[in-house]
Amino acid sequence: MLKTLGAQIKEFKKDSFLTPVFMILEVLMETIIPLMMASIIDNGVEAGDIHHIYVMGGCMVIVACISLFAGTMGGKYGARASAGFARNLRKAMYENIQTFSFSNIDKFSTAGLVTRLTTDVTNLQNAYQMLLRMCVRAPISLICAMIMAFFINARLASVYLIAVIVLGMILAIITVRAHHYFMEVFPKYDDLNASVQENVSAIRVVKAYVREDYEKKKFTQASKNIYNMFVKAEGVLAFNSPVMQIVVYSCIIALSWLGAKMIVAGSLTTGELMSLLTYCMNIMMSLMMLSMVFVMLAMSIASAERICEVLNEKSDITNPENPVYEVADGSVTFDHVTFRYNKTSDKPILDDVNLSIRSGETIGVIGGTGSSKSSLVNLISRLYDVSEGAVLVGGKDVRSYDLDTLRDEVSVVLQNNVLFSGTIYENLRWGDKNATDEECRHACRLACADEFIDRFPDGYNTYIEQGGTNVSGGQKQRLCIARALLKKPKILILDDSTSAVDTATDAKIRKAFAEEIPDTTKFIIAQRISSVQNADRIIVLDNGVVNGFGTHEELLASNDIYRDVYESQTSGSGDFDEKGGDQ
């Protein structure tokens, strides 16, 4: 864990080194000041030596200024180092997340990743700054104060040892108890973020089902759980202050009583007693700071472990040593492909799939929910790796390609598409950042998106709200199809992406595909047989097994599942879901 986190500090080694240096300088200056005060009282005030008071007073001001300068510089470099550390952590996590395959992403919840990128990183930032400053300042101050106290009067300094031992034991108990509660807080932050995310992203569904009160209660409960944990933790930490005060005041009373007796006896001066009392406060404050450091470190350890889970998670899909940088054509072959999401699972999602698809063919993929239609096409762009067998694109195993090269040649349009905040032009150019306005319009004509875009007052400069909330489901799907076409892919996958489009528009889109992109291999996943019956060939999937593969006419003649569903759909009484489960 330390090695993983330490890699994010390298850029700020100088700041991380200078911070404790200035902290040590500040502590040394603060340690000298009580001695100078004692000298002013004993050799200046009581002796009536004004010159000595002026000289020592001037020196004390200089030392205080040096201490102030050192503290300021320590704070500056500490803030720079901790903020830079946090920045690098966020960047490293975000960049690593971008490399994740779908199977890596499945290990984390979205809310959990957000919490790690925000709350957990902030905890580590605060802990690192505290580590550079307080973790240096507190023990050095404690040691210096103890040394000076024994130097002044070893007998009175023994009072410190008793106080330090008592306070140290109590603070250790408090720290351990608080750490237990803080360890339970962070998973509850995930629950809170998940509640917010689900509610905001599905606000229309919430309102449609009048579930606002339920969502409020769910959020309130998640927030209350965090509150309860923090109350317990802070309740334990609240003992810090009263315990500190009791020990400090007891120590001061003991020092004052013993010191007064020693002053009367002539074995201690007034200035020395004042110095001892000042060092007493320094020692107790150092212990207090150390206790807070331990609590913060206890919190940050939990955060550090969660962050390292993300940083140490390596994508199980990587480029080969000598990748292929060119896809010859859009041909696709499934060679005895078996696939499992969980490698330890006994039952495969896809079982011994054998298919050979020529470049430029239009392939329909039909099956009920749970028949693994999406899983099949996800293997083409290597979003997952096969468990057994091989998937070939352009005659080569997809595992031999450079990932960017392969995925640049495969465009996928999902049923639940995502549009980003920005103009229509900006969204379209996700497919090709260098696309001209005319190329964008041409892609929209193929996707039949120009029909509604031209009706917008701002046309292609119309601003799309976050998530595409100001366009309908069908409009969103057509914009996403246009975006995919701008990639000019060798393989186009439409994963039930015309489900929100009317039948007439669906037919227009299919006709445009046949005429305008005949060399592109097209996979059309659909529930409606009418959407794929004109395809060159159709794959019938049933529970992860290829039940049939052929033309519409061939399947009607030879495949019972296809024929039954076709007849039920043409009579308006059924679909593939009668044959399957979840996709």
Region annotations inferred by a language model:
Residues D49-I53, C144, M148-I162, K232-E305, ...:
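Helix-loop-helix
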Residues M1-E30, M37, V45-C59, I66, ...:
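Membrane-integrated ABC transporters
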Residues I33, M37, G74, G78, ...:
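Hydrophobic/aromatic residues in alpha-helical transmembrane segments
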